[in-house]
């Protein structure tokens, strides 16, 4: 088995601090926080502290936060929950596949939806929306890391923060937002839905009680996510420097490479396409050299292969490699990776 010396894949192991919290929770067990016994009251207090920790990190009020047992369902809750009869839905051609799914479902129900195009930098085109229309606006793209230089103009805004997490909070007003626990190295299966405009939102799922979202989340996972978040925020972050080095190295040392990522985008994502090289072969060569990377679309939908994001940006999809810069990636790892990349590309082009 090849020894991986630097892992640039998007998937990441659970943060050690969160793992310790999770083991403690499973060993201790947990009660129903809605009951009145001592253990339940203690857990309810702990959950409130967790909620306050999330609120502080996300710059929102504790009562605006809802925990989800699956982050993907947050797209339907956050988007469809804002739609009213007659509302139009706007989203972009570089949004996540879950957004496309919600838009398709709404269109099938007779709603007017508009998919906004983007330019070669991934900047969403201008639009005209009424105050009651809903606009999906991603803070940063999950493949390229590119940001939107402009704030959404009008409408009710759903902020997709699943890629950006706490690395970059929205700098615009929004009504609902969705965060994914894995973006701060927390456990999968935890989403954070922020509902700022409670008077303009309603639960779009079938329900017969007053709860805003399904209470199907795992309490130990939510608590572990909070622990991971605190640890993540306390760690040093040199990823902007590392991203700059990678982009400048590729630009100057390897010919015929199209870099989709802007240097001033979200620091943790780099996407580039190497001409005259098959991505899968390059991925395996890099793996043999000790470097794990991703290739193709970050979406999991078979309908969006190999990359609807690059296609929308009119970027080449052949030879595409994606890097995720995690906080434990060192400067030396990046230097070694760049040299290995140059060598692997030269080898494949020669053959």
What are these model-predicted stretches?
Residues 1-351:
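Pyridoxal 5′-phosphate
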């Amino acid at each position: 088995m090849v020894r991986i010396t630097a892992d640039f894949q998007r998937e990441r192991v659970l943060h050690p601090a969160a793992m310790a919290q999770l083991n403690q929770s499973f060993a201790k067990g947990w009660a129903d926080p809605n009951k009145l016994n001592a253990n339940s009251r203690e857990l309810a207090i702990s959950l409130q502290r967790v909620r306050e920790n999330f609120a502080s990190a996300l710059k929102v009020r504790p009562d605006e936060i809802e925990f989800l047992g699956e982050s993907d369902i947050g797209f339907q809750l956050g988007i469809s929950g804002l739609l009213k009869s007659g509302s139009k839905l706007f989203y972009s051609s570089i949004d996540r596949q879950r957004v496309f799914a919600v838009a398709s479902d709404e269109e099938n129900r007779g709603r007017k939806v508009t998919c906004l195009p983007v330019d070669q930098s991934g900047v969403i085109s201008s639009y005209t929306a009424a105050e009651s229309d809903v606009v999906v606006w991603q803070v940063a793209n999950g493949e390229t890391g590119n940001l939107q230089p402009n704030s959404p103009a009008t409408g009710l805004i759903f902020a997709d923060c699943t890629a950006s997490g706490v690395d970059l909070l929205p700098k615009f007003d929004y009504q609902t937002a969705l965060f994914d626990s894995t973006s701060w190295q927390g456990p999968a299966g935890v989403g954070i839905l922020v509902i700022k405009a409670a008077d303009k939102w309603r639960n779009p799922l079938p329900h017969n009680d007053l709860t805003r979202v399904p209470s199907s989340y795992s309490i130990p996972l939510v608590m572990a996510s909070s622990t991971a978040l605190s640890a993540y925020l306390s760690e040093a972050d040199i990823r902007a420097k590392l991203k700059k080095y990678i982009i400048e190295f590729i630009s100057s040392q390897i010919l015929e490479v199209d870099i989709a990522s802007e240097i001033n985008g979200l620091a943790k994502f780099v996407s580039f396409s190497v001409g005259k090289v098959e991505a899968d072969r390059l991925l395996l060569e890099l793996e043999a050299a000790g470097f794990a990377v991703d290739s193709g679309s970050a979406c999991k939908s078979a309908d969006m292969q190999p990359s609807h994001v690059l296609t929308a940006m009119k970027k080449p999809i052949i030879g595409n490699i994606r890097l995720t810069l995690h906080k434990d990636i060192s400067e030396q790892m990046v230097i070694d990776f760049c040299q290995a990349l140059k060598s692997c590309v030269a080898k494949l082009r020669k053959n």
